[in-house]
Each structure stands twice: as structure tokens, then as C-alpha cells.
């Protein structure tokens, strides 16, 4: 066997052992920046990355190197969150926001949804932890791909849970229907959670995923009303002012689609994120539960970046500190017919 190939395989095995060490412990070993070229080649193979030219490859490598330096800084913090190289590692943060989030800014829609202010005293006797997944009311994690339509995954995720709560059955609803047939929101270029519900009300219902499958791009509307699986009876937009009251709302209403700033979450791998700033809301996700680990309270959030992201597609953020700007007026949920 070629000596260079043997050397590469040995180095790759060493890097793999380092990655395994990272996942086996609470805090990972820091990436060796001098090994960035090897990390990058492994990354290209693992995620089947293809670049149009050597210039683009160099450009992506420089971003990749910067991102692993940032990951090292995050992993040096005094919290339990772990960050690792993932499929976004060759992308600058603004590109990730453009391609893989999709929450619109400003007011859209007809505002059919009732507005509820989430504030005031919380219930005195509250369970320490709560998770809708344990009751089989959450559908599987999905992947929005390179389409800025997080708003539809979050809104339909909440609607799927409402259907499961009411009918004790999980169904996957069609995100593609909203991409193609919601003409108020902007398909793969952004939208709002509550306007998705308003548009489902206007359409008359929503089909199941297998009847109107996801393409991750806008196509001509092919609505089939006879295939509607359910619809929206009422929708609600929440002005969240109090996280303890949000706990009560989550337990009594069901999973809630919320808006966050996802920039600090792009390279998340596991643990509880304690440092997540809000420099502008850009992503919609589904709030499904909460808990406490090592005296640190946290929220459980379902993302739409596939099951290989984070903790099987989920992320935990610290509760009670407005993590990622989640205390805002863009949260929403709906009742199914």
C-alpha cells in the first residue's frame, strides 16, 4: 500500500479517536488547528461536499478553519454545551441563516390569529420536567434542506402534535403544500409562523406528507382538497413576557412554535446551551418540553436540520435567561379541526 495513503489512514484514525473522545465525555478535546487541513478533507468526504473550483475550495477551507477556531472557543466555556464540526462547518454564519433558517421580518398575513399575552403569576405547583415526546405526541425530526422555510416546519410540527393530542395518532403533514400554495409567505425565502396557520385556514386544510412530498424548492401549487388530512380551527399568536408562564402554556396547550436567533446554535452537538445571544430573530423551531440537569434548567427544542444535528435533531437551551431571544411576540400554535 502507498506510504502516503497509510499515513493518511493513520492520521484519519487518530482524528476519529479524537472525535469519539469528544462524544464520550462532557467536554470534548479541542480541535488541533494545525490539523485543520486533515479535518477539512475528512469533512468533505463525510458530507459529500463538492466545490466548483480550487479557488472555492480554498475559500471554504478558510471559513472552515475560522469555524473550528470558534468551536474551540465555545468548548472552552464553563457550561455543559458541546460544539462540533457538522455539515455547516464550511459556511459563514450569514450564509447558514440565508439558506437554512427562513423566519421573515416584519408583519405579514391577515392577522386572523388571536393574540394572547403570556405573563402574570405562574402556577405554583409545576412539574420539574415535562416532555411531549414521552407521550408520543411529537413527529419525527425533519430536514428543511437548503430552503428558508423553517416557519412551515415549526408551524406544522405544532399542528401535527395538536392532531396527535386530539386523535392519539401521529401524522406527517405537507410542508411542500405551504411552500407552493401559501402566497402570503415567501416559500423558500421566508415566512412567519402565524401566517402559515392563516393560509391553511384560507386553503381549507393541509395534506399529508406522502400525498404532497417535500422538494425543498418552490413549485407550482398542486393543491388537492380531497386529500386534506386536517385543518386549522383557531390559531393563536403569543406575546411571551414570562418564561414560567410559558411552561404552563406548553403543558396545557401543547408544543409551541417559537422564534429564535439560531446563529449560536449552528455547530451545536449536545448539552445545555447557556450562551445564546439575540442579534435578530431568524429561525422558527418547536418547543416541546423542559427539564433540569445538574441544577441547570433548560428548554427542549425540536429543530428542522435533520436527526444528525445536535441531540438527535433537538437542542437544549438554558431556561429563564431568554436564550436565543425566545421571549418575543412571534410564538404561535393552532387547534386542529
From Swiss-Prot:
Q: Which UniProt keywords apply?
A: Disulfide bond, Hydrolase, Protease, Signal, Thiol protease, Zymogen
Q: List the disulfide bonds.
A: 147-188, 181-221, 276-324
Q: A GO biological process this protein is involved in?
A: proteolysis
Q: Which InterPro entries match?
A: Papain-like_cys_pep_sf, Pept_asp_AS, Pept_cys_AS, Pept_his_AS, Peptidase_C1A, Peptidase_C1A_C, Peptidase_C1A_papain-like, Prot_inhib_I29
The active site consists of 150, 283, 303
Offer an example of a GO molecular function term for this protein. Answer: cysteine-type peptidase activity
What this protein is called in its record is Viral cathepsin
Q: What is the lineage of its organism?
A: Viruses, Viruses incertae sedis, Naldaviricetes, Lefavirales, Baculoviridae
Amino acid at each position: 500500500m502507498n506510504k502516503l495513503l497509510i499515513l493518511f489512514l493513520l492520521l484519519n484514525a487518530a482524528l476519529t479517536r479524537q472525535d469519539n473522545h469528544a462524544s464520550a465525555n462532557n467536554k470534548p478535546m479541542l480541535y488541533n488547528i494545525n490539523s485543520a487541513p486533515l479535518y477539512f478533507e475528512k469533512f468533505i468526504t463525510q458530507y459529500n461536499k463538492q466545490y466548483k473550483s480550487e479557488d472555492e475550495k480554498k475559500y471554504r477551507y478558510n471559513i472552515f478553519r475560522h469555524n473550528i477556531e470558534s468551536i474551540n472557543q465555545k468548548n472552552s466555556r464553563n457550561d455543559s454545551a458541546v460544539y462540533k464540526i457538522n455539515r455547516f462547518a464550511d459556511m459563514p454564519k450569514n450564509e447558514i441563516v440565508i439558506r437554512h433558517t427562513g423566519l421573515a421580518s416584519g408583519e405579514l398575513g391577515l392577522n386572523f390569529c388571536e393574540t394572547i399575552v403570556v405573563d402574570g403569576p405562574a402556577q405554583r405547583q409545576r412539574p420539574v420536567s415535562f416532555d411531549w415526546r414521552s407521550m408520543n405526541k411529537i413527529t419525527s425530526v425533519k430536514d428543511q434542506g437548503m430552503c428558508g422555510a423553517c416557519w412551515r416546519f415549526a408551524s406544522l410540527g405544532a399542528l401535527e402534535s395538536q392532531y396527535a393530542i386530539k386523535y392519539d395518532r401521529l401524522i406527517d403533514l405537507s410542508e411542500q403544500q405551504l411552500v407552493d400554495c401559501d402566497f402570503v409567505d415567501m416559500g423558500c425565502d421566508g415566512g412567519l409562523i402565524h401566517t402559515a396557520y392563516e393560509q391553511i385556514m384560507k386553503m381549507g386544510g393541509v395534506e399529508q406528507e406522502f400525498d404532497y412530498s417535500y422538494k425543498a424548492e418552490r413549485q407550482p401549487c398542486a393543491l388537492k382538497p380531497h386529500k386534506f388530512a386536517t385543518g386549522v380551527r383557531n390559531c393563536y399568536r403569543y406575546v411571551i413576557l414570562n418564561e414560567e408562564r410559558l411552561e404552563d402554556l406548553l403543558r396545557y396547550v401543547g408544543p409551541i412554535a417559537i422564534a429564535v436567533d439560531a446563529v449560536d446554535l449552528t455547530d451545536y452537538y449536545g448539552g445545555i446551551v447557556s450562551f445564546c445571544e439575540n442579534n435578530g430573530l431568524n429561525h422558527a423551531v418547536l418547543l416541546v418540553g423542559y427539564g433540569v440537569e445538574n441544577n441547570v434548567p433548560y428548554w427542549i427544542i425540536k429543530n428542522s436540520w435533520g436527526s444528525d444535528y445536535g441531540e438527535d435533531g433537538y437542542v437544549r437551551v438554558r431556561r429563564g435567561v431568554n436564550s436565543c431571544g425566545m421571549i418575543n411576540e412571534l410564538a404561535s400554535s393552532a387547534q386542529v379541526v
